[in-house]
UniProtKB/Swiss-Prot annotation:
<feature type="region of interest" description="Disordered">
    <location>
        <begin position="27"/>
        <end position="81"/>
    </location>
</feature>
<dbReference type="InterPro" id="IPR046955">
    <property type="entry name" value="PHR1-like"/>
</dbReference>
<keyword id="KW-0539">Nucleus</keyword>
<dbReference type="InterPro" id="IPR017930">
    <property type="entry name" value="Myb_dom"/>
</dbReference>
<keyword id="KW-0804">Transcription</keyword>
<dbReference type="GO" id="GO:0005634">
    <property type="term" value="C:nucleus"/>
</dbReference>
<feature type="compositionally biased region" description="Low complexity">
    <location>
        <begin position="102"/>
        <end position="119"/>
    </location>
</feature>
<dbReference type="GO" id="GO:0010966">
    <property type="term" value="P:regulation of phosphate transport"/>
</dbReference>
<feature type="compositionally biased region" description="Polar residues">
    <location>
        <begin position="69"/>
        <end position="81"/>
    </location>
</feature>
<protein>
    <recommendedName>
        <fullName>Protein PHOSPHATE STARVATION RESPONSE 2</fullName>
    </recommendedName>
</protein>
<feature type="region of interest" description="Disordered">
    <location>
        <begin position="198"/>
        <end position="247"/>
    </location>
</feature>
<keyword id="KW-0238">DNA-binding</keyword>
<dbReference type="GO" id="GO:0005737">
    <property type="term" value="C:cytoplasm"/>
</dbReference>
<dbReference type="InterPro" id="IPR025756">
    <property type="entry name" value="Myb_CC_LHEQLE"/>
</dbReference>
<feature type="compositionally biased region" description="Polar residues">
    <location>
        <begin position="411"/>
        <end position="426"/>
    </location>
</feature>
<comment type="function">
    <text>Transcription factor involved in phosphate starvation signaling. Binds to P1BS, an imperfect palindromic sequence 5'-GNATATNC-3', to promote the expression of inorganic phosphate (Pi) starvation-responsive genes. Functionally redundant with PHR1 and PHR3 in regulating Pi starvation response and Pi homeostasis. Involved in both systematic and local Pi-signaling pathways. Regulates several Pi transporters. Regulates the expression of PT2. Directly up-regulates SPX1 and SPX2 expression, but PHR2 binding to DNA is repressed redundantly by SPX1 and SPX2 in a PI-dependent manner.</text>
</comment>
<dbReference type="GO" id="GO:0010167">
    <property type="term" value="P:response to nitrate"/>
</dbReference>
Amino acid sequence: MERISTNQLYNSGIPVTVPSPLPAIPATLDENIPRIPDGQNVPRERELRSTPMPPHQNQSTVAPLHGHFQSSTGSVGPLRSSQAIRFSSVSSNEQYTNANPYNSQPPSSGSSSTLNYGSQYGGFEPSLTDFPRDAGPTWCPDPVDGLLGYTDDVPAGNNLTENSSIAAGDELAKQSEWWNDFMNYDWKDIDNTACTETQPQVGPAAQSSVAVHQSAAQQSVSSQSGEPSAVAIPSPSGASNTSNSKTRMRWTPELHERFVDAVNLLGGSEKATPKGVLKLMKADNLTIYHVKSHLQKYRTARYRPELSEGSSEKKAASKEDIPSIDLKGGNFDLTEALRLQLELQKRLHEQLEIQRSLQLRIEEQGKCLQMMLEQQCIPGTDKAVDASTSAEGTKPSSDLPESSAVKDVPENSQNGIAKQTESGDR
């Protein structure tokens, strides 16, 4: 069986229905619906093109509609649209596609199709019973006449997406402009506060740079004149005029020699005062604070208390043993250093030999003591042996009478026995 095309259905005037789970509208309603001439559709299509879709509506939120389709042939048929309205286009397969749910193609090239919703244009107004229970008030009360009117040129789905994307782009552009204005306003305030904070710091920095240049110029002048001068090093926190008097200073060897001479002229470090030393030195960029601190260091370095007398004696002996080396004069050579190292090694070996000889003597003395103790113990043992021998010699002399008595007893007994035997024989 051959399939009937949609063009034949539209030309024959048979009502066309799209499959939908919603109940169908009875055919008797076709008689009550007035027909709209084609002339009225043209200005309405222009209005639909000019009116964009509201941005808050989306394809998925369109509620089910019921309307009528008006064609150029004059036939009017009921048309349903579910949550995803699908119209078939004229193609080889003539099947329903899911790519563009709002895409509808006209039955012929010369005819135009519109979907009119609302009683004011002569269309069919749906009743409350036609809506499904699941569908709620998903749209706003604004008129939606311009939502489903399409032309031949551009598909309806693309038009909707373009209008929605344009509206969303406009909203994003407005939000970005508002955000940029807000950020620019805040950054301007921050920049103004930063400028006001940094402006007061320009003066002290310039003053410190001027002070550094002045000190460098004075140093160059003093070096040309041949007089020693103190090199002042500004501290990192010295940005005010009050800190110029307490700037750090590097004491050169020449300046230290002049300081020592001034202290000696004043009678020593204990009697010298910072003011008197400053007057005698007559150095540039030198304040009383510098002289005072240097004088305290000089006193502590010169009069350092010794820990004990033994340590002082050891230090004196070491100074006498080791020859002095002039490191400042530059006479220190490698050969001299090697010679000193050899001398130290020799002294160490000598000390080790002395310790060994002492140990040997101690061992010999110990052996002598042991021999003496042994000799003292031997005479005592001889006396004990003599006493024991003498005691043993006395004991046999005392035992002699007993033995003689014993001997006498057997002899008497024998004599008696012999006498008895003689008397018995008789």
